[in-house]
């Protein structure tokens, strides 16, 4: 048996003893040599004791108790500590570039929009200040997207308890529409169609949803066959806003490219399952669909493999000619003397005139063309002006390099080094990039850009007011 923590109180020594198998308070009178059990606790041991002017303080069962040796009373103490808790007060926090997520651009690239700490922020390309359009610590606003006509912004908010789609004016001062999604969960990567009528996005259960922004009606366009930590089933709208393109896992765990017609619900498989195809992007003309494909992906299909090394992957760049009436943009060229004909006036089509996307299903896979660049570790594509495509190459020790291929020049150019994220505006004239802690907006024309071009300097001066206690209510 143990006897510990002796303290003097009056003419007696008080101590903890576990002679009856549970640590209780005992006393010893030196003048008589008598020992006495003072407490008869049966649930928890006494851990520590100390003596004060009014009795013995002891810790037991997670509480402090005061024992009066004269009366034998044991009183549980209620202790309230009013701390400063400055970290729980409302405060202004700096916006860190590394914490800006879900980036998007306004239609013409005049402002960038982000999610930050459950708020939606916009920043100007050059002139002006950053803007918090939500100011809601008590709810989380996520995944903003700007409408192609420029006057609306959509995002997901859990202010009702479940995530809903909120559509506001671009200043965030007026909620135009609130759309409830059936079977609410967590939603990802919204994309607004060019005709302003629909928004496509995915959910936790790997469904592609399409929401009518006018009526609020929603439907599931397709569902991925298997769960995978890399969410590659991200819908991309055709230039006319009538189709979406997306990769989908097949039985062999390779991904194939599909397109879905919103009006009819028709699905067309663009690529077979003999290669792993990702990152579909429509050409601005609507005639071609670019994508990346790998024929050496097989050893990487088991993503839960606990081995230390993954097999290296290479991908090649392809395009599919969608309409059988269109010819390949990469047909052999031959310089010939041009015969001058009588001049006729033709009305030039502007890039804003979105021609209808026509897809001829018959023979489609035979109209897939390999673009003449070496197979490398390409990780994604991004839209570009007509007959051009951005592609990203991951290079060991150099990071991700952004490059651009031009179907007219038939060669790639280095565009921007060391990029982490790339977003293209609706008009395909502006590019938002992140390189480390630098965000910038630059033009999609030309080549040889460098990190720092078009830097969003207003981020460094932006502060957001947060209410930590309201945030905790939302989080927990």
Kindly label every feature range from the protein language model.
Residues 1-4, 16-26, 40-47, 57-73, ...:
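A flexible loop/linker signature enriched in serine peptidases of the S9 family
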Residues 83-100, 357-374:
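A short helix->beta-strand "capping" segment at the edge of beta-propeller domains
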Residues 369, 396-476:
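Intrinsically disordered, Ser/Thr/Pro/Gly-rich linkers and terminal tails that flank
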């Amino acid at each position: 048996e143990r006897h510990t923590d002796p303290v003097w109180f009056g003419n007696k020594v008080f101590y903890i003893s576990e002679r009856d198998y549970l640590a209780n308070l005992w006393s010893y009178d030196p003048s008589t040599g008598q020992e006495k059990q003072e407490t008869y606790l049966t649930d928890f041991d006494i851990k520590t004791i100390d003596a004060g002017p009014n009795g013995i303080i002891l810790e037991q069962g997670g509480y402090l108790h005061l024992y009066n040796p004269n009366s034998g009373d044991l009183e549980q103490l209620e202790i309230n500590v009013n701390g400063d808790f400055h970290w729980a007060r409302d405060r202004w926090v700096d916006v860190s570039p590394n914490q800006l997520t879900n980036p998007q651009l306004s239609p013409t690239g005049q402002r960038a929009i982000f999610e930050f700490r459950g708020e939606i922020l916009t920043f100007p390309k050059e002139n002006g200040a950053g803007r918090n359009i939500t100011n809601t610590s008590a709810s989380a606003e996520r995944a903003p997207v700007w409408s192609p006509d420029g006057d609306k912004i959509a995002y997901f908010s859990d202010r009702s308890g479940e995530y809903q789609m909120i559509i506001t004016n671009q200043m965030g001062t007026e909620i135009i529409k609130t759309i409830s999604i059936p079977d609410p969960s967590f939603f990802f990567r919204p994309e607004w169609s060019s005709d302003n009528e629909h928004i496509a996005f995915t959910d936790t259960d790997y469904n592609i949803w399409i929401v009518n922004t006018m009526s609020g009606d929603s439907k599931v366009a397709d569902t991925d066959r298997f769960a995978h930590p890399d969410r590659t089933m991200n819908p991309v709208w055709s230039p006319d806003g009538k189709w979406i393109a997306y990769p989908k896992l097949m039985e062999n765990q390779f991904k194939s490219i599909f397109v879905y017609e919103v009006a009819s619900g028709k699905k067309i498989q663009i690529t077979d399952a003999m290669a792993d195809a990702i990152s579909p992007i429509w050409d601005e003309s609507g005639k071609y669909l670019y994508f990346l494909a790998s024929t050496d992906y097989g050893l990487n299909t088991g993503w839960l493999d606990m081995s230390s090394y993954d097999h290296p992957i290479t991908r090649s760049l392809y395009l599919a000619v969608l309409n059988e009436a269109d010819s390949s943009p990469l047909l052999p060229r031959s310089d010939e003397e041009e015969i001058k004909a009588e001049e006729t006036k033709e009305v030039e089509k502007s890039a804003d005139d979105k021609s209808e996307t026509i897809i001829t299903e018959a023979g489609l896979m035979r109209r897939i063309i390999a673009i003449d660049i070496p197979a490398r570790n390409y990780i994604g594509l991004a839209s570009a002006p007509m007959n051009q495509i951005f592609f990203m190459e991951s290079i060991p020790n150099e990071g991700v390099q952004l490059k651009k291929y031009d179907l007219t020049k038939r060669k790639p150019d280095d565009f921007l080094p060391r990029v982490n994220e790339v977003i293209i505006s609706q008009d395909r004239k502006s590019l938002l990039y992140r390189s480390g802690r630098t965000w910038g907006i630059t033009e999609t024309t030309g080549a040889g850009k460098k990190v720092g071009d078009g830097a969003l300097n207003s981020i460094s001066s932006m502060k957001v007011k947060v209410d930590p206690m309201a945030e905790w209510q939302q989080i927990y």
